[in-house]
């Protein structure tokens, strides 16, 4: 995925040093766009090993309309744990538990999970119930009946509920486009992109969503277009980025879906198959909360 490496290089060389909410510090570049052609392979990063299982389960979690981390931790997906843990630490019930203790309690104590595993009305809530509108159901029906519409939009940005969210949506707005060949593309607008940790995850997640929507609407997947506002590299990821830029991308893998699935809400992890994924070693980095 040279396209992604070019984006890293651009931000490293043309970005500006900027303070941020987390007090970590970033190099930021405002306004970027990258295109990934799914006809040439699935855009899962090869210059470091990606957590494919986590990517799939998070997307399925969004599609369920779920906003509690219990489903994720039950499947050993730990990408959202820090935010509810930070909220738990401010509660009267906090007795010095570690993050690991917190996650174990989410797994084993349903009542605790219901109280402290909540993230507020984040992505799943907005996708499936934006002020009473199931946007995923609506957009799929619209694609089927009016594929050339310019209104094939789903928004996770709900100003009236932002303050109730553990984290306001970074990937906040996406739109589908169907051409005369009945090929479908998806463009995501992401207000804020953590280029080392988050963005590769987002590329794969929305590309997978595009494959799913294409299948259930009877269309052919074409491009994922990724538009990012504040495109940044955290200062504690700079060395990891330099390592990644030295690596040669490998051939892109292939993703196939169970062809029997005709309703997007019926997909399960077992219906998604990643094939021929060749990759370099993982590169770890700390998430900024």
UniProtKB/Swiss-Prot annotation:
Alphabetical GO biological process terms: dTMP biosynthetic process; dTTP biosynthetic process; methylation
One Gene Ontology cellular component: cytosol
Keyword annotations of the record: Cytoplasm, Methyltransferase, Nucleotide biosynthesis, Transferase
Principal location listed in the UniProt entry: cytoplasm
Subcellular location: Cytoplasm
Database matches in Pfam families: Thymidylat_synt
Alphabetized NCBIfam families for the sequence: PRK01827.1-2, PRK01827.1-3, thym_sym
Stated name of the protein: Thymidylate synthase
Gene: thyA
């Amino acid at each position: 995925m040279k396209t992604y490496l070019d984006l890293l290089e651009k931000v490293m060389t043309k970005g500006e040093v900027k303070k941020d909410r987390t007090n970590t510090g970033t190099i930021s570049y405002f306004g970027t766009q990258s295109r990934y052609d799914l006809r040439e392979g699935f855009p899962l990063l090869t210059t470091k090993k990606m957590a494919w299982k986590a990517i799939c389960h998070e997307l399925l979690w969004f599609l369920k309309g779920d906003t509690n981390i219990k489903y994720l931790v039950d499947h050993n997906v730990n990408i959202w744990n820090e935010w509810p843990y930070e909220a738990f630490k401010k509660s009267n019930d906090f007795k010095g538990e570690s993050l690991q203790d917190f996650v174990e309690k989410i797994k084993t104590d349903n009542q605790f999970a219901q109280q402290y595993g909540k993230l507020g009305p984040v992505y799943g809530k907005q996708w499936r119930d934006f002020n009473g509108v199931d946007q995923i159901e609506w957009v799929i029906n619209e694609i089927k009946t009016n594929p050339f519409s310019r209104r094939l939009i789903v928004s996770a940005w709900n100003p009236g509920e932002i303050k109730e969210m553990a984290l306001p949506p970074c990937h906040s707005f996406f739109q589908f486009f169907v051409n005369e060949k009945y090929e479908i593309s998806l463009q995501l607008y992401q207000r804020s992109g953590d280029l080392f940790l988050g963005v590769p995850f987002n590329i794969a997640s929305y590309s997978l969503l595009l494959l799913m929507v294409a299948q259930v609407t009877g269309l052919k997947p074409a491009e994922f277009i990724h538009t990012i506002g504040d495109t940044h590299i955290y200062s504690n990821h700079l060395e990891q980025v330099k390592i990644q830029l030295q690596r040669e991308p490998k051939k892109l893998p292939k993703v196939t879906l169970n062809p029997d699935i005709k309703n997007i809400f019926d997909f399960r992890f077992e219906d998604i198959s990643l094939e021929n994924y060749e990759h370099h070693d993982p590169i770890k980095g700390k998430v900024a909360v």
